[in-house]
Swiss-Prot record:
This is Protein HIGH CHLOROPHYLL FLUORESCENCE PHENOTYPE 173, chloroplastic. Component of a high molecular weight complex containing psbA mRNA, OHP1, OHP2 and HCF244, and PSII core proteins D1/D2, HCF136 and HCF173. Interacts with LPE1. It is found in: Plastid, Chloroplast membrane; Plastid, Chloroplast thylakoid membrane; Plastid, Chloroplast stroma. The gene is HCF173. GO terms for biological process: photosystem II assembly; translational initiation. InterPro entries: Galactose-bd-like_sf (IPR008979), NAD(P)-bd_dom (IPR016040), NAD(P)-bd_dom_sf (IPR036291), NADH-UbQ_OxRdtase-assoc_prot30 (IPR013857). It is a peripheral membrane protein. It comes from Arabidopsis thaliana. Disruption phenotype: Impaired photoautotrophy. Seedling lethal. High chlorophyll fluorescence phenotype and severely affected photosystem II (PSII) subunits accumulation associated with a drastically decreased synthesis of the reaction center protein D1 due to a reduced translation initiation (ribosomal loading) of the corresponding psbA mRNA. Plants lacking both HCF173 and HCF244 display stronger PSII defects. One of its GO terms (cellular component) is chloroplast membrane. Residues 73-84 have a biased composition (Basic and acidic residues). Its main location: plastid. The lineage of its organism: Eukaryota, Viridiplantae, Streptophyta, Embryophyta, Tracheophyta. Keywords: Chloroplast, Membrane, Photosynthesis, Photosystem II, Plastid, Thylakoid, Transit peptide.
C-alpha cells in the first residue's frame, strides 16, 4: 500500500480557538506594517506668490535635496499644519494620493485592531445566550467584521447551515473539538450523550442540540438521527472489559448505522424513491414468483480423467421453502467443478448501473464464500460480452455483503475494466476451492463441499459524492499489550458492520492521542498497519470535519499519525503537500492515492 505525508496547517485563529486546554481563550496578532518607502510621502516645496517678483541672488550655496526628504524650514511649517499635498496648480501634473499620519501610526493601528477584537469577542461571547434584537447598523458592522474582514471568514463552509451533523461521543477528547469546529463553520450540531447533567452541559456549547441516548440501546437512537445528514462517531469504550467494548465499539456502530439507514429509507419512501440515497432494487425474494428467471448451471474448470473414476457428482437447487425463504443449496464433489445461479437483469426504463457504485446483497446461510460474476457487453450482440468477477464471504446467519464495482476483475486479463453501463447479467457461483470452515464446533463438522445460501434482496448502491458516516477507530498502538487484541477485535467488528451497512463511510484510525495544539506537524496517511507514532486530538478532529464534504474520503479506511522517520524498507510514502496555507485542503491529495473499500 502507498501512504502519503501531508503538512497539516490549520488556520492560526482556528488553532487558538481549539487549543489543547479547550478553553475559550482568544488572542489576535496584528502585524503593523511600517512604511519604509519614503517616496510615498511627498512634501512639496513652498509655492511662490501669484505676482512674480525677482528675487535677490542668494549668497548661500544651494544644497541638493533628495525626493521625499524635508528641509528644516519646510518640515516645521508643513508638518505642524497638516501632512498633506498642496493643491496642484492648473499647469502642474496631478499630485499622488494623500496619506494621513494616522494611517501609518503604530498606535492608531493598534487601537483599531483592538476595537475589531473587542467587537468580535463580544459577539462570540453572546452565542448561546438569550436572543436579542440587533440594530441594522450593528448587524452591518458584525457582517463586515466576521465576513469581509474578520478572522473567521475563511472557516465558513457554503451550505453548512443546511447540514445537521450528529456527533456521538461529543464529550470525548476528540468529540469536544469536533463540536467546536463544526460550530465555527456554521453547521447545525446534535450531540448524543448518555446522561444530561451539569458536568456534561458545561463541556458543550449551549447552542448544541443535546440528545440523550445510548448506542447500546437501539430504541433510543431513533430520535437522535432525525433530521441528521451526517454522523461523526467519536465514542469509545471507557474500559477494556469485553462487554463494554462490544456494546460501544461493535454493537454501538451497528445500531447507529441501522437507525440511520432506517431513517434514510423512510425519507426515500416519502419521496417516492427519488431520494439521492435510494438504492436500486434488482431482486427481492418474497414469493415463489420472484424466483422466475433464475437459472442453475453446472460446469468444470478442467477435466481430470483419474479423478472422474471417484467423482461424486454435483447438484444444486433454488427453491422457495416452506419457511418462505429463497434458498440456493447443493453440493459439489467433482474436482474442479462449480454450480451457479444466473439471471439476466431487467432494469427500469431509463436506468443504468453506471449511476451506482456497487451491489449490496442481504443473504444468510452456512458461511461459505462465493464468486459474483457480472457479464457486460452490447445488448445487441451477446457474443461480445465479457465476464468480471469478485469474491465475497458470508457469515453463518444473515448478513449484508457489499461488493463495489471497483472490486470486479476481468476473467480475461486482456479485457478492459468493468463498465457498469453495459452490465446485463448477474451470476452467483459456488466452488469448493478456497473454502474455510466456520469458527466453532459446528463449522468443524461441516462438509466444505456443500453450501446453503438464503436470499433476501439484491440492490445497487447509489454513487454518492460525500461520506455519510465518519468513524474514529484506532490502530492499536498505545493500548496495553495484554488487551490490544481484545480492543482491536471489537474495533474491527464495528468497522466491518459500517462497511456492510451500505452507507458512504470514512474510517479514521489515529495513532496514540496527544493533548497538544493541532496543525503543528505534518501528517502521515497510510493503509499498511505501519502507524506507530502519536497524533494530536485537534488534528484528528480537523480530519473529521474536512472529510465531511471531501469526495476522496468516501468509502476509505486509513491510518494517520504525525510525521516520523520511516524505518528501512517502508519508505513508500509520497510527499503530496508541504507548508500549506489556511486555504489549502491537505486531505484531498493525501487520500487520492489511497484505495477504496479496504
Amino acid at each position: 500500500m502507498v501512504g502519503s505525508i501531508v503538512g497539516s496547517n490549520m488556520a492560526a485563529t482556528d488553532a487558538r480557538f481549539l487549543s489543547s486546554n479547550f478553553g475559550n481563550s482568544f488572542s489576535i496578532n496584528t502585524r503593523i506594517h511600517r512604511f519604509h518607502d519614503r517616496s510615498q510621502i511627498v512634501i512639496p516645496r513652498a509655492q511662490s506668490s501669484s505676482s512674480p517678483s525677482p528675487s535677490p541672488p542668494s549668497d548661500k550655496k544651494k544644497t541638493k535635496t533628495r525626493p521625499g526628504t524635508i528641509t528644516t524650514k519646510e518640515s516645521e511649517e508643513t508638518v505642524a499644519k497638516k501632512l498633506d499635498v498642496a493643491p496642484p496648480s492648473p499647469q502642474s501634473p496631478p499630485s499622488p494620493p494623500t496619506l494621513k499620519l494616522d494611517d501609518v501610526n503604530p498606535v492608531g493601528l493598534g487601537r483599531r485592531s483592538r476595537q475589531i477584537f473587542d467587537e468580535v469577542w463580544r459577539k462570540f461571547s453572546g452565542l448561546g445566550q438569550m436572543s436579542r434584537t440587533t440594530r441594522p447598523d450593528e448587524q452591518e458592522t458584525l457582517d463586515s467584521l466576521l465576513i469581509r474582514e474578520g478572522p473567521m471568514c475563511e472557516f465558513a463552509v457554503p451550505g453548512a447551515q443546511n447540514v445537521t451533523v450528529l456527533v456521538v461521543g461529543a464529550t470525548s477528547r476528540i468529540g469536544r473539538i469536533v463540536v467546536r469546529k463544526l460550530m465555527l463553520r456554521g453547521y447545525t450540531v446534535k450531540a448524543l450523550v448518555r446522561k444530561q447533567d451539569e458536568e456534561v452541559m458545561s463541556m458543550l456549547p449551549r447552542s448544541v442540540d443535546i440528545v440523550v441516548g445510548d448506542v447500546g440501546e437501539p430504541s433510543t437512537l431513533k430520535s437522535a438521527v432525525e433530521s441528521c445528514s451526517k454522523i461523526i462517531y467519536c465514542a469509545t469504550a471507557r474500559s477494556t472489559i469485553t462487554a463494554d467494548l462490544t456494546r460501544v465499539d461493535h454493537l454501538g456502530v451497528y445500531n447507529l448505522t441501522k437507525a440511520f439507514q432506517d431513517y434514510n429509507n423512510r425519507l426515500a419512501q416519502l419521496r417516492a424513491g427519488k431520494s439521492s440515497k435510494s438504492k436500486l432494487l434488482l431482486a427481492k425474494f418474497k414469493s415463489a414468483e420472484s424466483l422466475d428467471g433464475w437459472e442453475i448451471r453446472q460446469g468444470t474448470y478442467f477435466q481430470d480423467t483419474t479423478a472422474s473414476k471417484y467423482d461424486g457428482g454435483m447438484d444444486a437447487k433454488f427453491e422457495f421453502t416452506e419457511t418462505e425463504r429463497a434458498e440456493f443449496s447443493g453440493y459439489v464433489f467433482t474436482r474442479g467443478g462449480y454450480v451457479e445461479l444466473s439471471k439476466k437483469l431487467s432494469l427500469p426504463l431509463g436506468t443504468t448501473l453506471d449511476r451506482y457504485e456497487g451491489l449490496v446483497l442481504s443473504v444468510g446461510g452456512n458461511g461459505r464464500s462465493y464468486v459474483v460474476i457480472l457479464e457486460a457487453g452490447p445488448s445487441s450482440d451477446m457474443s461480445q460480452s465479457k465476464q468480471y468477477f469478485a469474491r465475497i464471504s458470508t457469515k453463518a446467519g444473515f448478513c449484508r455483503v457489499r461488493v463495489p464495482f471497483s472490486a470486479f476483475r476481468p476473467v480475461n486479463p486482456e479485457d478492459p475494466p468493468l463498465d457498469p453501463f453495459l452490465v446485463h447479467t448477474l451470476t452467483i457461483r459456488f466452488e469448493p476451492k478456497r473454502q474455510r470452515p466456520v469458527d466453532g464446533l459446528a463449522g468443524a463438522q461441516q462438509d466444505l463441499r456443500s453450501f446453503s445460501l438464503v436470499f433476501e434482496y439484491i440492490k445497487a448502491l447509489p454513487a454518492g459524492q460525500e461520506t455519510d458516516f465518519i468513524l474514529v477507530s484506532c490502530t492499536g498502538s498505545g493500548v496495553e499489550a495484554n488487551r490490544r487484541e481484545q480492543v482491536l477485535k471489537a474495533k474491527r467488528a464495528g468497522e466491518d458492520s459500517l462497511r456492510r451497512s451500505g452507507l458512504g463511510y470514512t474510517i479514521i484510525r489515529p495513532g496514540p492521542l496527544k493533548e497538544e495544539p493541532g496543525g503543528q506537524r505534518a501528517l502521515i496517511f497510510d493503509q499498511g498497519n505501519r502507524i506507530s507514532q502519536g497524533i494530536s486530538c485537534a488534528d484528528v478532529a480537523d480530519i473529521c470535519v474536512k472529510a465531511l464534504h471531501d469526495s476522496t474520503a468516501r468509502n476509505k479506511s486509513f491510518d494517520v499519525c504525525h510525521e516520523y522517520v520511516a524505518e528501512q524498507g517502508i519508505e513508500l510514502y509520497e510527499l503530496v503537500a508541504h507548508l500549506p496555507d489556511k486555504a489549502n485542503n491537505y486531505l484531498t491529495p493525501a487520500l487520492s492515492v489511497l484505495e477504496k473499500n479496504t
